[in-house]
């Protein structure tokens, strides 16, 4: 299954690295052009497999809407050109990055996975809710500060709950508790 992986933060690279290693050679990575992400991607020889990488800018600060629009346009052009020859993408997986999911819906990518670990990222949740087909939230999600987004997601998408603490997965994935060592079968 050809997959597009979206890395917005170094922790996302570490979180999704085992899944990327078990993917296919035709997978594509969309990575934010941040110093930490670029350094981690370039220094991961032997840890992360080499994949076609699309570097995009991070839409923050003054001009963030223009940057977001350029980011979506770049992703659309690159994914279209990568899909030529009949080798279409079947899935896109993004951690807190809804812009790529919006592009994926327009391109007809059937499985669009949104993973969130931050209850207060309301703007990203709003953008992802109408375009994601599946969403993953941790079991320790605090509904008292999420402004009702968990319920809103459960009405529109297939909602999955992931066991384990967020910090364990991001900081040292090899030290996760035994009961969550196996990757969930719905992402593999």
Question: What positions do the PLM features span?
Answer:
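An aromatic- and histidine-rich active-site surface loop
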Residues: 13, 39, 92-107
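A conserved, positively charged/aromatic
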Residues: 113-114, 125-137
């Amino acid at each position: 299954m050809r997959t597009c992986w979206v890395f917005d933060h170094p922790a996302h690279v570490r979180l999704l690295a085992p899944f990327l290693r078990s993917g296919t050679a035709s997978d594509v990575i969309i990575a934010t052009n941040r110093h930490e992400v670029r350094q981690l991607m370039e220094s991961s020889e032997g840890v992360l497999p080499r994949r076609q990488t699309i570097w995009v800018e991070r839409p923050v600060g003054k001009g963030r809407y223009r940057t977001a629009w350029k980011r979506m346009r770049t992703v659309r052009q690159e994914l279209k050109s990568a899909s030529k020859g009949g080798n279409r993408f079947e899935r896109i997986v993004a951690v807190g990055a809804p812009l790529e999911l919006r592009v994926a819906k327009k391109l007809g990518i059937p499985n669009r996975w949104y993973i969130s670990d931050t209850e207060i990222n309301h703007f990203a949740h709003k953008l992802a809710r109408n375009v994601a087909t599946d969403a993953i939230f941790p079991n320790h999600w605090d509904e008292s500060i999420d402004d009702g987004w968990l319920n809103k997601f459960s009405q529109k998408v297939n909602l999955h709950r992931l066991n384990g603490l967020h910090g364990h997965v991001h900081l040292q994935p090899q030290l996760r508790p035994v009961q969550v060592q196996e990757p969930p079968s719905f992402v593999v």
